[in-house]
């Protein structure tokens, strides 16, 4: 099991998940995203059909927004 999945099982409560079902399956550890796609620790790719408003509009990891965020973080981190 991927380290992220182990940490998730140990420390994260998923309030809208049936715990009995969740405990039987190995969690998916998402490690990167680009555009509308996500990738897990095993290299499997998924279409993100559950994205937030931000990623619905811009996708995951858009270069222009990443640059703007880096510039802003140099001025004020939060």
Model-derived regions: residue spans:
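Glycine-rich loop-to-alpha-helix module at the N-terminal edge of alpha/beta enzyme cores
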Residues: 45-78
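Active-site and channel-lining beta-strand-loop segments
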Residues: 27-48
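Conserved active-site and cofactor/substrate-binding residues in soluble primary-metabolism enzymes
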Residues: 3, 33, 60, 64
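Active-site-adjacent loop/helix segments that line or gate small-molecule/cofactor pockets in enzymes
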Residues: 1-32
């Amino acid at each position: 099991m991927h380290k992220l999945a182990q940490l998730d099982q140990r420390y994260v409560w998923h309030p809208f998940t049936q715990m009995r079902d969740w405990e039987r399956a190995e969690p998916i550890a998402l490690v990167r995203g680009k555009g509308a796609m996500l990738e897990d620790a095993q290299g499997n790719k998924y279409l993100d059909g559950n994205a937030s408003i931000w990623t619905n509009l811009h996708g995951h990891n858009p270069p222009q927004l990443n640059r703007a965020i880096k510039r802003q973080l140099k001025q004020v981190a939060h």
